[in-house]
Amino acid sequence: MIRGRMLAIAILAAAAAAGITALIVMNPVPPIDVMVERDVQATNWGPLALAFPGFSWIGDAKGAVLDVLVFIAVLIWNRGAWVLAVAGFMTGAWYVLLSHLINRQRPTTALVLQVTEHPVASSFPSGHTIFIATVSTLLMLCLGHRYMPRWALPIGWAAVAVIVFDGAISRIYTGAHWPTDVLASLLITAAWISFILSIRWISDRAFAPKQADRSHARLAS
């Protein structure tokens, strides 16, 4: 069975990501990217900027270690959500595929105000953005919905939104990515996770009440 609303969100997000991808293939450096990047870099982000070095640091193998730690946490505290966690982390496969298919040059100081990071891979999409959005969302879906009281869920999702926004802005501020790289990455993540949630067999297991988990455990024993 399929959750129609989540599938519709997945289709819309995927279509938007495809549109941005087509745009940058036809015009790798659209003027809107340069304008937005310069505006972001000229802005004083205050306390949000304190986390920028952390978002830069989390790349490479350190991200894989965090993925493993999150998966272990899901196995311990919400075993029924392990399929959701594994499927969710497949956003990394989308990054690998698209970064090999689309070789986009990264921002340079000839066009933007600063470039403080110099990754060698394709600028499109933003692997950091996909990673941050995926991990934050999966933590909320797999553990937040299990243990947080209902009144606190909006607060939890607001925290996720702030973290994802801050991480996205950091990739533009450092000059590591163009704004369209970051926007497409958010849409790719939203499309994939929404698609997974649309599959009831996966989402029902992840959001099953604790009592149902104990019943399954007794049956298994």
Predicted regions and their residues:
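N-terminal transmembrane-helix/juxtamembrane module of multi-pass inner/ER membrane proteins
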Residues: 1-64, 101-121, 220
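Membrane-helix interface segments
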Residues: 47-48, 77-82, 149-155
